[in-house]
């Protein structure tokens, strides 16, 4: 293709990809399968690599993430990003309303969900995104333009050539947060405490490729100077932003009076667990800009807005002890052992203590009355100590200096907060590697859970993953609660795992920094273990989302004689070393019932796991999301389906039972 043809085709591709991205990330209603989007993206990347001068500021390829930055520049906000005064009860809201009415008379309000994320400012010139910044101290923030470009719901070009500055909240959805922490746990990295910290940490990465891998989202909630654009009210501004192509939260309401505001607050206090993202309250703003101007602001916050904060569900219980565990990468993690207590609807007996620094900073002692909450309503964590309840019997805790399993000296590597055991033959690490290898996300060996692995390990029957493939029935039946039938089933599951596709084996090997998603990308790209073993650092970094740190870890792994020996053993036992999945560019069957549809899974499926069902739907061109909305096309309901099924029925969305679901995926295999 000559340059003129390339220029025309690049323009076509940009228009298509920007439209498809808007449908997918903003409207939540994709019109093409993911595979088609990926194919077009790869075509545009190839053109821009051949003709770099054709790359434009609104090109969707800008979302992949550019080279790492040396530091963040400071950005002065043209209009200050003020914080809001807080309200903690109905009385505070009525006091706010009374002050408003005293100044400007009756006023209508706009209520919006207060997203628990990171406030950002985004600036556009002639319709093009030119700069993004954090809130900082309200007058000066940090330039995070390159990281914000990686958020797919943020338009790089608006639908009109206007110049404006919008304000919004970048956040990490619950599903992305759980997935990220699972991947970090698999890599032996410290877990994020909550989705807000994860979002903030992602946007403050100097390497935009890291931000691109984190699946962040963004709602825009206002304009820095809306009246200059001829807009008279906040509700009009939100509608205008939405019309320009921004993602604006649909869960908002214009309220005629404070009673309607209080009803909205009460409604979302009960409904917030159903949301796919975290909120920590409701923002209430006077709707009229003329009234806002009349009310003015204090030095810290506007008088025309207030943030109602939901009370965090925190409970107090006793810290019985602190358990120290060694993970498969050698990271030593302290866990609080608690008197059982109910938090956010579940009984909690264990909670994260993060690391040694956290325990020291909070001065947490065994026997303390400690405050527990669920971080982002997801992970139980100790957030503080009730010092007034100390009676002198509490015991300060010190992290061990030697590994509790192998007694090797623990070390803290440069730049890390965690202590590590560096002994590669540490029994705890060997055991955890076996558990990881057999896990559902890796080799998926049914029946080979933590208890069975521990028995096998303690009996001296296995030391590394290759040993699993030479186990015999006679060895297994000697284990506790392992009869002949159970032994036969386990051996069959081990045998079946030999046929897994490469990405499962690759993830199961536990290479540092290589989570399930990276393993999938590597397997798709290299197709065989042999090619991956021979890959150079540069070839690895050519794979989307594989950065320098991961590439270094992969090359270091394959350079170890122990890794070479292990792979030779696995080959000898007949373990598959090739990628069996569809190429990302593959088309879904034309007659697929899932092609281009947004699907929600709810309840328990008898025939397969949730992840397996998701894989089947995506293989057939569908997209799986975590919550039911008007843009959902189909809900698949298993046993004990709950609120998602009810919402689907209310919205008139098509619902399938498991039998119909199996019918369709089996038809798609023909």
From Swiss-Prot:
Q: Which family does it belong to?
A: Belongs to the NAD-dependent DNA ligase family. LigA subfamily.
* Catalysed reactions, semicolon-separated: NAD(+) + (deoxyribonucleotide)n-3'-hydroxyl + 5'-phospho-(deoxyribonucleotide)m = (deoxyribonucleotide)n+m + AMP + beta-nicotinamide D-nucleotide
Q: What does this protein do?
A: DNA ligase that catalyzes the formation of phosphodiester linkages between 5'-phosphoryl and 3'-hydroxyl groups in double-stranded DNA using NAD as a coenzyme and as the energy source for the reaction. It is essential for DNA replication and repair of damaged DNA.
- The UniProt record gives the binding positions of Zn(2+) as 403, 406, 421, 426
EC code(s) of this entry: 6.5.1.2
Which keywords does UniProt give here? DNA damage, DNA repair, DNA replication, Ligase, Magnesium, Manganese, Metal-binding, NAD, Zinc
SUPFAM superfamilies, alphabetized:
BRCT domain, DNA ligase/mRNA capping enzyme, catalytic domain, Nucleic acid-binding proteins, RuvA domain 2-like
Q: What broad taxonomic lineage does this protein's source fall under?
A: Bacteria, Bacillati, Bacillota, Bacilli, Bacillales
Residues at the catalytic site: 114 (n6-amp-lysine intermediate)
Q: Which organism is it from?
A: Geobacillus stearothermophilus (Bacillus stearothermophilus)
Q: Which GO terms describe its biological process?
A: DNA repair; DNA replication
Q: Name the gene.
A: ligA
Annotated NAD(+) binding sites: 34-38, 83-84, 112, 135, 169, 285, 309
Q: Supply the name of the protein.
A: DNA ligase
List cellular component terms (GO).
cytosol
* Keyword Iron-sulfur annotated: no
Record keywords: tRNA processing included? no
Please list the cofactors this protein needs: Mg(2+); Mn(2+)
**What's a single GO MF annotation on this record?**
DNA ligase (NAD+) activity
Occurrences of domain BRCT (ranges): 589-670
């Amino acid at each position: 293709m000559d340059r003129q043809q390339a220029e025309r085709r690049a323009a076509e591709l940009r228009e298509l990809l920007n439209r498809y991205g808007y449908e997918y990330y903003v409207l939540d209603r994709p019109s093409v399968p993911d595979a088609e989007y990926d194919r077009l993206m790869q075509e545009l990347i190839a053109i821009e690599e051949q003709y770099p001068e054709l790359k434009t500021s609104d090109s969707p390829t800008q979302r992949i993430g550019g080279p790492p930055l040396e530091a963040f520049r400071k950005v002065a906000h043209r209009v200050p990003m003020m914080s809001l005064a807080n309200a903690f009860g109905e009385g505070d809201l009525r006091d706010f309303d009374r002050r408003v009415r005293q100044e400007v008379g009756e006023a209508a309000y706009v209520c919006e969900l207060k997203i628990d994320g990171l406030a950002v400012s985004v600036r556009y010139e002639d319709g093009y995104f030119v700069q993004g910044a954090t809130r900082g101290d309200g007058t000066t923030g940090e330039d995070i333009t390159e990281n914000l470009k990686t958020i797919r719901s943020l338009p790089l070009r608006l639908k009109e050539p206007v110049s404006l500055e919008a304000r919004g909240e970048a956040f990490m959805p619950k599903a992305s947060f759980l997935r990220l922490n699972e991947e970090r746990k698999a890599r032996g990295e410290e877990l994020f405490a909550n989705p807000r910290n994860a979002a903030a940490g992602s946007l403050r990465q100097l390497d935009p490729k890291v931000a691109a891998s984190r699946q962040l989202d963004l709602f825009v909630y206002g304009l820095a100077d809306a009246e200059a654009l001829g807009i008279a009210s906040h509700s009009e501004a939100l509608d205008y932003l939405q019309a320009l192509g921004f993602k604006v939260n649909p869960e908002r309401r214009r309220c005629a009076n404070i009673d309607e505001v209080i009803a909205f607050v009460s409604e979302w206090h009960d409904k917030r667990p159903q949301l796919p993202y975290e909120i920590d309250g409701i923002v209430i703003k006077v709707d009229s800009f003329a009234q806002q101007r009349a009310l003015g602001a204090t030095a810290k916050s506007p008088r025309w807005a207030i943030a109602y904060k939901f009370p965090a569900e925190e409970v107090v219980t006793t810290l019985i002890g602190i358990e120290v565990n060694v993970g498969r990468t050698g990271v030593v993690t302290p866990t609080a052992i608690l008197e059982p207590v109910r938090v956010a609807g579940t009984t909690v007996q264990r909670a994260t203590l993060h690391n040694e620094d956290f325990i020291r900073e909070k001065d947490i002692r065994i026997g303390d009355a400690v405050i527990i909450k669920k971080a982002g309503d997801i992970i139980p964590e100790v957030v503080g100590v009730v010092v007034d309840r100390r009676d002198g019997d509490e015991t300060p805790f010190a992290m061990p200096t030697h590994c509790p399993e192998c007694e090797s000296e623990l070390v803290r590597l440069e730049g890390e907060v965690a202590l590590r055991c560096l002994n590669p033959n540490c029994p705890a690490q060997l055991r955890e590697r076996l558990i990881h290898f057999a896990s559902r996300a890796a080799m998926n060996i049914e029946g080979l859970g933590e208890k069975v692995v521990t028995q096998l390990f303690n009996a001296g029957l296995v030391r590394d993953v290759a040993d699993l493939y030479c186990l015999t029935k006679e060895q297994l039946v000697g284990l506790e609660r392992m009869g002949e039938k159970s032994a036969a089933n386990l051996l069959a599951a081990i045998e079946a795992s030999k046929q897994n596709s490469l990405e499962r084996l690759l993830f199961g090997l536990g290479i540092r920094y290589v989570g399930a998603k990276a393993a999938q990308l590597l397997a798709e790209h290299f197709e065989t273990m042999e090619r991956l073993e021979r890959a150079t650092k540069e070839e690895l970094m050519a794979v989307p989302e594989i950065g320098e740190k991961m590439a270094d870890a992969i090359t270091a792994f394959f350079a170890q004689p122990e890794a070479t020996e292990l792979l030779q053993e696995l080959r000898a036992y007949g373990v598959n070393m090739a990628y069996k999945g569809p190429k990302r560019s593959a088309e879904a069957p034309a007659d697929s019932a899932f092609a281009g549809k947004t699907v929600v899974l709810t309840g328990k499926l008898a025939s397969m796991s949730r992840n397996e069902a998701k894989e089947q739907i995506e293989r057939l061109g569908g997209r799986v999301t975590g919550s039911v909305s008007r843009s959902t096309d189909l809900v698949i309901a298993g046993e004990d389906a709950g609120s998602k099924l009810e919402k689907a029925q209310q919205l008139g969305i098509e619902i399938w039972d498991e039998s119909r679901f199996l019918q369709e995926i089996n038809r798609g295999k023909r």
